[in-house]
Regions:
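Hydrophobic transmembrane alpha-helices of secondary-active transporters
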Residues: 18-30, 40-73, 173-183, 192-217, ...
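Structural signature of hydrophobic alpha-helical transmembrane segments
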Residues: 38-54, 100-115, 159-174, 219-231, ...
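Hydrophobic alpha-helical transmembrane segments in multi-pass integral membrane proteins
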Residues: 22-26, 87-94, 149-158, 204-218, ...
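Intrinsically disordered, low-complexity non-transmembrane regions of multi-pass membrane transporters
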Residues: 1-11, 128-138, 303-327
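Transmembrane alpha-helices that form the ion-translocation and gating core
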Residues: 75-114, 222-274, 298-308
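Juxtamembrane helix-boundary/capping and inter-helix hinge elements in multi-pass membrane proteins
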Residues: 62-72, 95-104, 114-136, 142-143, ...
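Entry/N-cap segments of selected transmembrane alpha helices
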Residues: 39-45, 62-93, 144-145, 209-240, ...
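Cytoplasmic-side transmembrane-helix entry/capping segments in multi-pass membrane proteins
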Residues: 9-16, 69-83, 132-141, 167, ...
Length: 327
């Protein structure tokens, strides 16, 4: 009964536990913060570990010859999301100044639009994409944090961060890939674990969210989420379709705001104190965008994937053959 319900919801294996975790963290956080294994598995403390294991298991399914496709697909998604977020934010900043427009500063816009939720992407690619789509997740992790936001706002001086961020993100998947290529039996054994971990990842991430942030972010936070999802997402989908020659479902899957993006305005304000007056408001708006896009994007991605085709739901035999060739 529970499984049938979860399968009816787009990315339900992750989204439903995520919402449950967010509800508990909002109203009764003390239930899961009792220490030991309970806190480790049912709070945000366990998120990175669960995601790391998930990526390791995914890595065991990859062959070295597939890495070119991974870099190409992931690179298009990463760059296009950065370009649209930076472009909107810079234009707003140049035209309207630091206060921005409609209550949204360029700090809030760039922080939200350039950062994507990798776990939502991975869950959606598990439902609609192929293993090359899934393997692009560590590459997309580069935009999860302040680095690209700082670049977009002209705050340099951290040239070693991109390389180290990439190394840290691809470590689990690289080790898994090496072991999987050495021993196919090991690959066959570990491959299913990626899907099994989805609800645990979802709950851990949800336990780091507070639903009251939607209220604190106000109408501007909701507007920011809509900009991230629909304006940013539409641009990424166009790049995915015309550069990568893909149907576009992966483009929608990265049209989110990362949970970690909530900390970005404070980091930027610390680097450039002129942004301090705007940091608190931007933080609440980015938090609202993170929650809203985590709900909207799975619904949109599911609709798009089924309407225009994806590896799990090809439109016709010709598209199915194309997906098999590209996988």
């Amino acid at each position: 009964m529970i499984m049938r319900f979860l399968k009816k919801i787009p990315a339900g294996m992750m989204v439903v536990p995520m919402l449950l975790g967010a509800i508990i963290n909002t109203f009764i956080p003390e239930v899961t913060n009792i220490g030991s294994f309970t806190t480790a598995i049912f709070t945000s403390a366990g998120a990175n570990t669960a995601i790391g294991i998930q990526l390791f298991c995914l890595g065991t399914t990859l062959r070295f010859r597939e890495m070119g496709g991974v870099v190409k697909r992931g690179g298009v998604l990463l760059i296009s999301k950065f370009v649209i977020g930076a472009a909107i934010g810079i234009v707003v900043g140049k035209v309207f100044g630091p206060t921005g427009v409609l209550g949204l500063s360029s700090l809030a816009i760039i922080s939200a639009v350039t950062n994507s939720n990798g776990s939502v992407y991975l869950a959606l690619m598990n439902s609609y994409g192929d293993k090359v789509d899934q393997a692009a997740m560590p590459l997309l992790a580069i935009n999860d944090g302040p680095m690209l936001t700082m670049i977009a706002m002209g705050l340099g001086g951290l040239a070693d961060i991109p390389f180290m961020a990439l190394v840290a993100a691809i470590g689990p998947i690289l080790v898994g890939m090496i072991l999987g290529n050495i021993d196919k039996d090991l690959s066959d054994f570990l491959a299913p674990a990626g899907s099994i971990l989805l609800p645990f990842v979802g709950f851990c991430l949800g336990s780091g969210m507070n639903l009251t942030n939607i209220v604190k972010g106000g109408a501007q936070g909701i507007l920011l989420g809509l900009v991230t999802c629909f304006i940013g997402g539409a641009f990424i989908v166009l790049c995915d379709k015309f550069i990568s020659r893909r149907p576009g479902y992966a483009g929608w899957a990265v049209a989110t705001t990362a949970g970690n993006a909530v900390a970005v305005p404070a980091v930027i304000a610390e680097a450039d104190p002129s942004w301090l007056p705007f940091a608190d408001v931007a933080t609440s708006q980015v938090a609202a965008s993170a929650i809203l896009t985590a709900i909207l994007v799975p619904i949109i991605t599911s609709w798009w994937a089924k309407k225009y085709g994806c590896p799990q739901f090809p439109k016709d035999e010709a598209q199915k053959a194309l997906f098999e060739k590209q996988a």
